[in-house]
UniProtKB/Swiss-Prot annotation:
Electron transport keyword on record: no
Residues the entry annotates as binding [4Fe-4S] cluster: C81, C87, C90, C162
Active site, renumbered: C389 (nucleophile)
Domain TRAM: residue ranges: 10-68
Listed name of the protein: 23S rRNA (uracil(1939)-C(5))-methyltransferase RlmD
Enzyme nomenclature, EC number: 2.1.1.190
Residues given in the record as S-adenosyl-L-methionine binding sites: Q265, F294, N299, E315, N342, D363
Single Gene Ontology MF annotation: iron ion binding
GO biological process: rRNA base methylation
Length: 432
């Protein structure tokens, strides 16, 4: 959710106030009222009373730090992760999953001015199938640090456990740490990316200087013994495949291959449900043509092609368009065409834009889809499904559809990232 702030107003006094929170924002901050404005307090849950020290005071809102909690919510939980509160990855492990989902759904409801019809969720723990861990070596203790950044800082939190990772990746952490620590070039490592999909786990190791033959041999031994596909990244845009098959995952009975650097949804369980719900909402009929904008490598496009007469996918990243074409052939889908085009530019003269479509699906990045909304209206599709990772731009873009006579038929909150402040959603719009 987008928030816009002016320059900080320094608090010159360390006044202690006592407040009771009456809500939780989508980021997991407690919300109270102080002098008629919102007071945001990290770590405090709805209904909890606390002594708070103001850390920031502005015209429309303020922020405070808990000095002493005076009461405890029944929805407060003990965080599972020993790094919670320091690591910047999660913000809400202290709140029950039900409270997290309810607060996010309420935030979405306020922004869209409509009740949320459902919350689409999966396991709250062990859901994250992709992670990037920073690496830093110091000659003295602790030696190799491997982990995530602190909240609001570039400092590294040395992570030994991460309960939001899928179990196979979390179990890999200590063995991976031992392997990397043993390398002669350990001081020249940048980060390691871990991915776990249907084909198995993989790792991408970014190294800043060439690795010795001995180090490469150690990494290959680790790859074979742990069953982990291995890629090296000597440059930020270069990959060297040392071991293991090309990664792939299953979706809607299809096999989707991808490069380790390609975007895939982090939460497989919610992604599967999201695709199924989009197909259900669109109600594809025989003979219909469907347009999929911001299509990536075909996460929605290919399942749509199994049902529609024909599907067009449009994506700005050339590598993803190539992967979409490859996956269409791999799955023997001959009724789908992919186009590369920057959807932030004028689309009206593009070949695909001259065609007619019965239904449209779009899944833009956080910036939304302002550049194509008017063209979608001109196409006059009967139904539009908008998948969003930013409710602020969903709200903005939906105004174009509503002004053109569409109505919001369904609204769902996607709990894609439990225990974090990320709020994702999807909406169905229909034209009478």
């Amino acid at each position: 959710m987008a928030q816009f702030y002016s320059a900080k107003r320094r608090v010159t006094t360390r006044e202690i106030i006592t407040v009771t929170t009456d809500g939780l924002d989508a980021f997991g901050q407690g919300v109270a009222r102080h002098h008629g404005k919102a007071l945001f307090i990290a770590g405090l849950l709805p209904g909890e009373r606390a002594e708070v020290v103001l850390s920031e005071d502005k015209k429309q809102f303020a922020r405070g730090d808990v000095k002493k909690r005076l009461s405890e919510s029944p929805e407060r939980e003990t965080p599972r992760c020993p790094h919670f509160g320091v690591c910047g990855g999660c913000q809400q492990q202290h709140a029950s999953v039900a409270l997290q989902q309810r607060s996010k759904a309420q935030a979405l409801c306020r922004m869209m001015k409509r009740e949320v019809d459902e919350v689409i969720s999966g396991p709250a723990w062990g859901y994250r199938r992709r992670a990037r861990l920073s690496l830093n070596f110091t000659p003295r203790k602790p030696g190799l640090q491997m982990g995530f950044r602190k909240a609001g800082s570039n400092d590294l939190v040395d992570v030994h456990r991460c309960p939001v990772l899928v179990p196979r990746l979390e179990a890999l952490l200590p063995k991976l740490r031992d392997c990397l620590s043993s390398l002669d070039g350990v001081r020249h490592l940048g980060h390691v990316e871990l991915v776990d999909v249907t084909s198995g786990p993989l790792m991408v190791l970014r190294h800043l200087k060439p690795l010795s033959a001995a180090d490469r041999e150690k990494l290959e031994c680790f790859s074979h013994s742990e069953g982990v596909a291995l890629y090296l990244a000597p440059q930020s845009d270069t990959l060297e495949h040392l071991n293991g098959e090309m990664p792939w995952y299953e979706s809607d009975g299809l096999r989707l291959t991808f490069s380790p650097r390609d975007f895939i949804q982090v939460n497989d369980a919610v992604n599967q449900q999201m695709v199924a719900r989009a197909l259900e909402w669109l109600e594809i009929q025989p003979g219909e043509r469907v347009l999929d904008l911001f299509c990536g490598m075909g996460n929605f496009t290919l399942p749509l092609a199994r049902r529609a007469e024909s599907v067009v996918g449009v994506e700005g990243v050339a590598a993803l368009v190539e992967k979409g074409d490859y996956n269409a052939g791999l799955n023997a889908l001959k009724n789908v065409t992919f186009f590369q085009h920057n959807l932030e530019e004028d689309v009206t003269r593009q070949p695909w834009a001259q065609q007619g479509f019965d239904k449209v699906l779009l899944d833009p990045a956080r910036a939304g889809a302002a550049g194509v909304m008017q063209h979608i209206v001109k196409l006059k599709p009967r139904r539009v499904v908008y998948v969003s990772c930013n409710p602020a731009t969903l709200m903005r873009d939906s105004e174009t559809l509503l002004a053109a006579g569409y109505r919001t038929v369904r609204l769902a909150m996607l709990d894609m990232f439990p225990h974090t402040g990320h709020l994702e959603s999807m909406a169905l719009f229909e034209r009478d």
